[in-house]
Amino acid sequence: MTKREAEELIEIEIDGTEKAECTEESIVEQTYAPAECVSQAIDINEPIGNLKKLLEPRLQCSLDAHEICLQDIQLDPERSLFDQGVKTDGTVQLSVQVISYQGIEPKLNILEIVKPADTVEVVIDPDAHHAESEAHLVEEAQVITLDGTKHITTISDETSEQVTRWAAALEGYRKEQERLGIPYDPIQWSTDQVLHWVVWVMKEFSMTDIDLTTLNISGRELCSLNQEDFFQRVPRGEILWSHLELLRKYVLASQEQQMNEIVTIDQPVQIIPASVQSATPTTIKVINSSAKAAKVQRAPRISGEDRSSPGNRTGNNGQIQLWQFLLELLTDKDARDCISWVGDEGEFKLNQPELVAQKWGQRKNKPTMNYEKLSRALRYYYDGDMICKVQGKRFVYKFVCDLKTLIGYSAAELNRLVTECEQKKLAKMQLHGIAQPVTAVALATASLQTEKDN
């Protein structure tokens, strides 16, 4: 091989990832785009250095020179994730950014850790062309594989890579619903939203044999179909059916949880490397993909269909309304710098009104939203019994409705819950020596604490 040939880069594509391959003296060096990631399952108690051995056969290159990092924080390859602060158990799915290009120190940067469901049921279809197998949604999750054999078996997450794929698919579409304001409950979907879901699943699972016209129906019609009717419409729709069942199971689990705990304050599992002393937050969340794990990454959603309210204020086919959105922010401990309760009588203040408007615009997919438009929308509530403007106080509004009757918690109770959750977060960060960003809420909290101490 000539030097020129050795220096020549050949662009190839493997598993959908663009790579550059250079061969010289039997050494293969591959370069990845910085934004590209690979997923890999690993036991939480296994030395993290084994990640290289797991990835090398897949990437077809040597990773000896690569450091292993957790969100850019270097890890000890001889110790497990558990020993370095990741407090969970079993097998986890890592989202790993492979950095291996000229001028940058090579490393494997773990961006996200996902905890898959503990148990799944695998339904294997005997005929890929005439799908007649019965899909069973079990307590945690469902996985369907097609390999030409006929049997049903229960497996653990340690033995199935597909478990994590389904967990990622469920979490991925949750984020898509969040981004576009699509109702969580499929029964509330419009025809366009049903088609959007079909296209998303087809892309996620590389499907090309689904006729979109067969599912040009509303979410209510979709959810009225039993498995047999669904497969008559979509002969090869096993994956679509399984994904739909997961979404519906998730909604049911969320509703069951809300019956026991009406407002759930976001308390994610924080992964904090024990050896890290950082001036900025360096935490990562373990996402539990179990259908029963209704406590996900957001503050609670308060849906009009989940809670009966006078006059059915939600409207818009289940889409979130402005009053719901504000209440959602008010129950999010991480949003207190832009909006917070004032006292215990239902008053709240937009500390950063333009930021609140921006968040509302993102939720409704309206990039031009600003506070002027938001305030006009709030005026529609003035004549009713939901929200009013507090006279003489700038950017201060008040819930005049009975929140206790509406959602089960009063404004005072909500304020107390969010405050307690924020204090727990601050205490945890202080325990691990991680500095808290200075915000108006943080300063106010510190000031109140000082007054109490004195």
UniProtKB/Swiss-Prot annotation:
Residues 297-316 are annotated as: Disordered. GO terms for cellular component: chromatin; nucleoplasm; nucleus. The modification Phosphoserine is found at S303. InterPro entries: Ets_dom, ETS_fam, GABP_asu_N, Pointed_dom, SAM/pointed_sf, TF_GA-bd_asu, Ubiquitin-like_domsf, WH-like_DNA-bd_sf. Pfam families: Ets, GABP-alpha, SAM_PNT. It is found in: Nucleus. Residues 320-400 bind DNA. Residues 168-251 form the PNT domain. GO terms for biological process: blastocyst formation; cell differentiation; negative regulation of megakaryocyte differentiation; negative regulation of transcription by RNA polymerase II; positive regulation of transcription by RNA polymerase II; regulation of transcription by RNA polymerase II. Keywords: DNA-binding, Nucleus, Phosphoprotein, Transcription, Transcription regulation. Belongs to the ETS family. Heterotetramer of two alpha and two beta subunits. PANTHER family: ETS, GA-BINDING PROTEIN ALPHA CHAIN. Transcription factor capable of interacting with purine rich repeats (GA repeats). Positively regulates transcription of transcriptional repressor RHIT/ZNF205. (Microbial infection) Necessary for the expression of the Adenovirus E4 gene. This is GA-binding protein alpha chain.
